């Protein structure tokens, strides 16, 4: 017996290997899945007969789910139902259990239920998943009358009438979307359960089976549920997803459903995609994947809506006329006749204008969605060059209402891609990294959504400055159009900001926009990264930085538009990207630039700014009873840079702590004056190792450093400030944890022994799949006798501690650091000098670069 099972197991293995070979040679996937199902039939029937379950009328073996539909994937579960009569003996039940054991022994992943017809029907009446799988059952062996009885007992006359089943499946899909629609699943989508995945196809078949009593979706054409073209589209989507799923199972050697990063690379190679100069093979493959699930989801939405409107609520219509072409039916817009778009193609865009103009419209009727899809061919060259068309499109952004829902629908129905060729190019475009969580088209629409949110009261508390600015914005449509085009040239190679500006220029000309409006839109696209790069990479407390930033703004009003676009862009890139620290940096840059642009700081140089801050801090300290002379003596040792970086309140607090201290080092951990991060302030006798010690301790406490300012005072004391965030990129709220870090820093900085060891931590699973080549560039700052070191590399635990050890070894002095992490990519800026206090020479730069690359490569653990 065991020998027989071993032979069968080997036969299954050989058959699957042959299938994989056929699949690799591009055999039709429908044929592959059906062949596998039929082959498994023979194995199961053989085992069923072997266990003598086929005699008489006591048992019936049924295939369920995808197996019942003859759609078996390489490592899919084999869902079985064994029905038996009420009077079956214990010995016969034991044979049924032995049959299941044999299935497992031969290597079949079997999920099973052994039960009576009445018990199964009772369970189906309470469980949506059970009734759904039963509807796909297929007789394999045994007494067929048992299956017929189950069909009768689970009929819509007895349970789950089609409207009840429809709403239950709709809720099930919404729950699935909520679970699998998160960012992580967008980066590594679930091909089976994710939005637009195979489940979206199966629900269409299930509800049509339940209502129309059909066996195949193609039969729904005769009922008007689906058109021939829509059926062909769904078949295309299904075959694409089946091929990807079969290949995924084959490569994983198990029932893997998630397109994780490592499998994305392997699948792209398997399907023959090749890297190009401007786009990776994996990005091409995932673009095709996202376009398929977008189309699949769009069809799913339209057909479910059609079922709801036509079958469930077909007798409950309230009609309100909008104009000669459109009307509302139960608050859903629809055409008044099916010739509207053919007679006037511009009405396609006009429909979406109505959606923006009338926010009370809940959506578009399914029949009209179908008509839009069938009319896309009308949006040709003549359509796009029409002045009437241009006016309607621009007016979508000029109503003063939120255009997001209308634009989202235009994207889903294919209208945006047909109207703007450049938008079609980025539809489905994904970047292979951890930073960009969405496709370019979806990110673009999220940026527009975020801009609209700035106007809404419920977001005013989260974005108070944005809310204030946008209410005074003269022409919001300029901001929306800047957002629409800001990433339009992604994936082409070259600078997407420059290429996008060219597209924006052509768009504004074609849409007859005023010269000043056109200039601002083009500028926004060209410089949409300016504000975030300045805030995160440069010293925004340096008046020269503000001056250089403002010189790139042609007019003061450009700042308002740029700030709003920057915040919306960051928030729309990745849900985890926006935090209080970025918020505070951008606000400080905005306010500093606003002041400079309005000439309020025209005559204030560094010395004047320092003098003002000193005076404010002095007033605070004197009011607390500290003498003027004591304060002056201490401040006389500080460098002017310190007073530029800190607020008067923080300067006063630091000064009091130093004057009241009885031992060194002085370590203070407190909220940063912007409240966006946590500040670590250290004052102690000069020690070359202090930066290395501090970064090592902070790394061991799992905090991230955002900025560092390192100052050696004239009295040979070190005055350093760090801005840190916790693991969630937020300021510290846990006081005990702050005290623990403070104590650890004090202990190690006071210790004259060895440097603290950096605890080794594994890279996250996601980070292991990316390899950012380490790049190091130097720029000499002759004014300050410093060298700017710009480092790009893979993110990893303890990276800054590794860099600090290299600086220490080579006697490199750090003056300032700006730390920026974008997904797996780190972009850090260090302001350094050699041990004599001057910029690095060529030889020193070469040695430093080689040492950094070596140590960083060794630290990837």
Swiss-Prot record:
Annotated keywords: Hydrolase, Magnesium, Multifunctional enzyme, Nucleotidyltransferase, Repeat, Transferase
Activity regulation (UniProt): Uridylyltransferase (UTase) activity is inhibited by glutamine, while glutamine activates uridylyl-removing (UR) activity.
EC number: 2.7.7.59, 3.1.4.-
Any matching Pfam family: DUF294
Catalyzed reaction equations: [protein-PII]-L-tyrosine + UTP = [protein-PII]-uridylyl-L-tyrosine + diphosphate; [protein-PII]-uridylyl-L-tyrosine + H2O = [protein-PII]-L-tyrosine + UMP + H(+)
Domain of life of the source: Bacteria
ACT domain span: 679-760, 788-861
Cofactors demanded by this protein: Mg(2+)
Gene3D superfamilies: Beta Polymerase, domain 2, Hypothetical protein af1432
Disulfide bonds: none
Ranges where the record places region Uridylyltransferase: 1-321
NCBIfam families: UTase_glnD
Family affiliation: Belongs to the GlnD family.
Domain-related comment: Has four distinct domains: an N-terminal nucleotidyltransferase (NT) domain responsible for UTase activity, a central HD domain that encodes UR activity, and two C-terminal ACT domains that seem to have a role in glutamine sensing.
PANTHER family reported for this sequence: BIFUNCTIONAL URIDYLYLTRANSFERASE/URIDYLYL-REMOVING ENZYME, BIFUNCTIONAL URIDYLYLTRANSFERASE_URIDYLYL-REMOVING ENZYME
Name the UniProt record assigns to this protein: Bifunctional uridylyltransferase/uridylyl-removing enzyme
């Amino acid at each position: 017996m065991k020998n027989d099972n071993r032979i069968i197991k080997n036969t299954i293995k050989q058959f699957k290997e042959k299938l994989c070979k056929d699949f690799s040679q591009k055999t039709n996937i429908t044929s592959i899945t059906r062949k596998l199902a039929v082959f498994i039939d023979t194995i199961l029937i053989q085992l069923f007969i072997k266990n003598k379950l086929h005699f008489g009328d006591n048992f019936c073996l049924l295939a369920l789910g995808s197996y019942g539909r003859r759609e078996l994937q390489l490592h899919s579960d084999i869902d079985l139902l064994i029905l038996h009569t009420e009077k079956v003996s214990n010995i016969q039940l034991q044979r049924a259990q032995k049959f299941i054991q044999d299935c497992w022994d031969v290597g079949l992943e079997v999920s099973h239920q052994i039960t009576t017809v009445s018990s199964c029907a009772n369970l189906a009446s309470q469980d949506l998943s059970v009734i759904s799988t039963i509807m796909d059952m297929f007789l394999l062996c045994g007494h067929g009358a048992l299956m017929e009885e189950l069909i009768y007992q689970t009929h819509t006359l007895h349970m789950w009438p089609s409207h009840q089943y429809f709403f239950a499946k709709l809720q099930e899909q919404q729950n699935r979307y909520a679970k699998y629609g998160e960012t992580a699943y967008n980066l590594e989508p679930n091909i089976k359960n994710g939005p637009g995945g195979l489940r979206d196809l199966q629900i269409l078949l299930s509800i049509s089976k339940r209502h129309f009593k059909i066996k195949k979706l193609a039969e729904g054409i005769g009922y008007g549920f689906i058109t021939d073209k829509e059926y062909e589209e769904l078949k295309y989507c299904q075959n694409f997803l089946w091929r990807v799923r079969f290949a995924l199972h084959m490569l994983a050697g198990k029932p893997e459903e998630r397109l994780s990063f490592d499998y994305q690379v392997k699948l792209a190679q398997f399907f023959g995609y090749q890297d190009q100069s401007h786009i990776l093979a994996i990005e091409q493959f995932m673009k095709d994947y996202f376009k398929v699930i977008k189309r699949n989801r769009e069809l799913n939405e339209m057909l479910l809506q059609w079922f709801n409107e036509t079958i469930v609520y077909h007798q409950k219509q309230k009609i309100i006329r909008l104009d000669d072409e459109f009307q509302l039916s139960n608050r859903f817009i629809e055409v008044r006749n099916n010739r509207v778009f053919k007679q006037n193609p511009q009405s396609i865009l006009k429909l979406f204008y109505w959606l923006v103009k009338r926010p009370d419209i809940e959506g578009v009727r399914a029949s009209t969605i179908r008509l839009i899809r069938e009319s896309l061919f009308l949006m040709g060259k003549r359509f796009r060059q029409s002045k009437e068309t241009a006016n309607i499109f621009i007016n979508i952004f000029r109503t003063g209402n939120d255009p997001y829902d209308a634009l989202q629908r235009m994207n889903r129905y294919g209208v945006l891609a047909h109207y703007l060729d450049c938008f079609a190019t980025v539809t489905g475009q994904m970047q292979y990294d951890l930073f960009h969580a969405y496709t370019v088209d979806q990110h673009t629409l999220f940026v527009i959504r975020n801009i609209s949110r700035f106007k809404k009261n419920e977001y005013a508390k989260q974005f108070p400055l944005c809310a204030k600015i946008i209410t005074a914005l003269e022409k919001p449509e300029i901001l929306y159009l800047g957002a629409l085009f800001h990433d339009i040239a992604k994936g082409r190679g070259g600078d997407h900001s420059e290429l996008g500006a060219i597209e924006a220029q052509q768009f504004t000309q074609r849409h007859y926009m005023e010269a000043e409006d056109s200039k601002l839109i083009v500028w926004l696209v060209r410089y949409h990264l300016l504000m975030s790069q300045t805030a995160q990479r440069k010293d925004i407390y340096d008046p020269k930085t503000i001056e250089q930033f403002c010189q790139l703004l042609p007019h003061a009003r450009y700042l308002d538009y740029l700030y709003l676009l920057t915040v919306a862009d960051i928030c729309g890139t990745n849900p985890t990207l926006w935090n209080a620290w970025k918020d505070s940096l951008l606000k400080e840059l905005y306010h500093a630039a606003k002041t400079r642009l309005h000439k309020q700081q025209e005559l204030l140089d560094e010395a004047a700014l320092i003098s003002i801050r000193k005076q404010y801090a002095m007033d605070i300290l004197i009011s607390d009873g500290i003498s003027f002379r004591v304060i002056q003596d201490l401040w006389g040792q500080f460098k002017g840079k310190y007073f530029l970086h800190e607020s008067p309140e923080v300067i006063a607090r630091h000064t009091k702590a130093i004057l009241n201290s009885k031992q060194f080092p002085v370590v203070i951990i407190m909220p940063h004056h912007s409240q966006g991060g946590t500040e670590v302030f250290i004052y102690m006798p000069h020690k070359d190792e202090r930066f290395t010690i501090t970064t090592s301790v902070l790394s061991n406490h799992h905090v991230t450093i955002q900025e560092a300012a390192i100052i050696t005072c004239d009295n040979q004391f070190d005055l350093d400030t760090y801005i840190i965030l916790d693991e969630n990129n937020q300021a510290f709220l846990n006081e005990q944890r702050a005290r623990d870090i403070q104590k650890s820093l004090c202990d190690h900085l006071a210790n004259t022994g060895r440097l603290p060891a950096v605890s080794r931590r594994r890279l996250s699973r996601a980070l292991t799949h990316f390899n950012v080549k380490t790049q190091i560039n130097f720029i000499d700052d002759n004014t300050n006798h410093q060298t700017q070191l710009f480092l790009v590399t893979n993110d990893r635990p303890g990276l800054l501690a590794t860099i600090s050890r290299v600086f220490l070894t080579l006697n490199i002095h750090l003056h300032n650091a700006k730390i920026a992490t974008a997904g797996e990519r780190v972009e850090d800026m260090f302001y350094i000098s050699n041990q004599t206090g001057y910029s690095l020479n060529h030889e020193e730069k070469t040695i430093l670069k080689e040492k950094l690359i070596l140590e960083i490569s060794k630290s990837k653990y």
